[in-house]
């Protein structure tokens, strides 16, 4: 009764129980709460299409594994994929998300202009969003999962140059899809 403010409890008993809860550093079990509430949650992931062995494959597999674990907690994860080299594909995926009004969105912000438009709509609808792999800090995502690009580049260069002889040539290759 004290935990959930249900029913009458004397002030003396309430204070005694609250003191014990504080001493024990009591935290409610979010899984039990989710199961008891019977509310269903839907989260959407927006990731690039991928095949085994490609960069995004392990991320997709992680989402698949998490979705299986969360299913018993009334949490449904819907995955939407787009062609990472095609802005139209990304825009179509955004439109799909906006028609569904999920409880949250995890997305790879590959195209900045379209991502900005999506996050603006999500904010209007009070739908939280999280970025993965790339961060667009001015869009104020709830969270970001990925590397710190500057620090990663700095470390890579430092390791590359660690045993570098003064006469060595270094080549850097970067692929672009056309």
Predicted regions and their residues:
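Amphipathic helical "hinge" segments at domain boundaries
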Residues: 28-88
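N-terminal helix-turn-helix DNA-binding module of bacterial transcription factors
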Residues: 1-38
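Short beta-strand->loop
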Residues: 46, 171-178
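Hydrophobic alpha-helical segments within soluble ligand-binding/sensing domains
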Residues: 144-171
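Flexible loop/hinge segments that line or gate small-molecule binding clefts
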Residues: 110-152
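Short, well-structured alpha-helical segments in soluble
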Residues: 87-103
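Periplasmic-binding protein-like
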Residues: 98-109, 128-132, 169-174
């Amino acid at each position: 009764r004290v935990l959930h403010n249900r029913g009458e409890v004397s002030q003396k008993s309430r204070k005694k129980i609250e003191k014990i809860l504080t001493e024990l550093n009591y935290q409610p079990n979010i899984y039990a709460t989710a199961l008891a509430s019977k509310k269903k949650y839907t989260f959407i992931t927006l990731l690039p299409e991928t095949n085994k062995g490609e960069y995004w494959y392990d991320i997709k597999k992680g989402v698949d594994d998490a979705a299986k674990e969360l299913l018993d907690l009334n949490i449904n994860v819907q995955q939407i994929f787009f062609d990472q080299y095609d802005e139209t594909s990304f825009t179509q995926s955004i439109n799909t998300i906006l028609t569904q009004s999920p409880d949250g969105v995890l997305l790879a912000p590959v195209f900045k202009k379209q991502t900005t438009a999506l996050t603006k709509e999500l904010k209007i609808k009070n739908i939280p969003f999280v970025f993965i792999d790339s961060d667009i800090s001015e869009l104020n995502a709830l969270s970001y999962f990925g590397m710190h690009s500057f620090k990663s580049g700095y470390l890579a260069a430092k390791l590359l140059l660690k045993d570098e002889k003064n006469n060595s040539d270094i080549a850097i290759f970067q692929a672009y899809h056309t």
